[in-house]
């Protein structure tokens, strides 16, 4: 599933687009995300995103700008993790569902980004992986006293160390079904705010 916001060039030379690539997973067993205490640098939050190859150098150049780093689209939530799993690790089919969902959604985002260059219609394409699930979500992390805590959450960012995206981290937004409506609204606003900065010559469509 995909949802996107597009900005077209008035001269007809293609478009810029922010596209949310969404993988939906139904599972009754809880998912546990393992918390990460230190955020990655502001420039890395921008640069380590999935974009079409011919726009990658532009994204790297933009990553050093503070006005780009401060955009909500590139912000990481306080609830951020470096790994996740289902409580029983495997479902009845023997599949690690959270891992499979992460792999599927990142591969889909990379494939869409590459296709934009093949079709030669996109000047700037940004693909953001999102996993939506009805599985109860929990964050497991150390508190300031060094004690292990477990708490229920609705939305988190997964900084997944897997090379499939071509970056040190694949940044994936994890959203519980109950938070989907609120997230959808903010995601639309975030995309609308960033597009004029990514592609100042275009017009929103």
What is each PLM-predicted segment?
Residues 3-205:
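Intrinsically disordered, low-complexity Ser/Thr/Pro/Gly-rich regulatory segments
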């Amino acid at each position: 599933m995909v949802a996107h916001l597009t900005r077209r060039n008035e001269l007809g030379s293609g478009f810029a687009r922010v596209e949310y690539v969404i993988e939906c997973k139904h599972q009754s067993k809880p998912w546990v995300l393992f918390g990460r205490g230190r955020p990655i640098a502001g420039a890395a939050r921008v640069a380590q995103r999935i974009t079409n190859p011919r726009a990658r150098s532009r994204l790297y150049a933009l990553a050093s700008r503070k006005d780009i780093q401060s955009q909500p689209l590139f912000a990481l939530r306080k609830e951020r993790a470096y790994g996740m799993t289902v409580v029983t690790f495997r479902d009845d089919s023997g599949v690690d569902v959270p891992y499979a969902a992460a792999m599927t959604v990142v591969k889909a985002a990379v494939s869409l980004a590459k296709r934009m260059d093949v079709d030669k219609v996109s000047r700037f394409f940004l693909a953001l992986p999102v996993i939506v699930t009805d599985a109860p979500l929990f964050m497991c992390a150390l508190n300031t006293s060094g004690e292990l805590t477990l708490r229920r959450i609705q939305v988190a960012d997964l900084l997944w160390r897997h090379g499939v995206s071509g970056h040190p981290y694949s940044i994936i937004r994890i959203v519980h079904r109950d938070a989907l409506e609120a997230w959808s609204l903010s995601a639309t606003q975030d995309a609308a705010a960033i597009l004029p900065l990514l592609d100042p010559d275009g017009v929103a469509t």
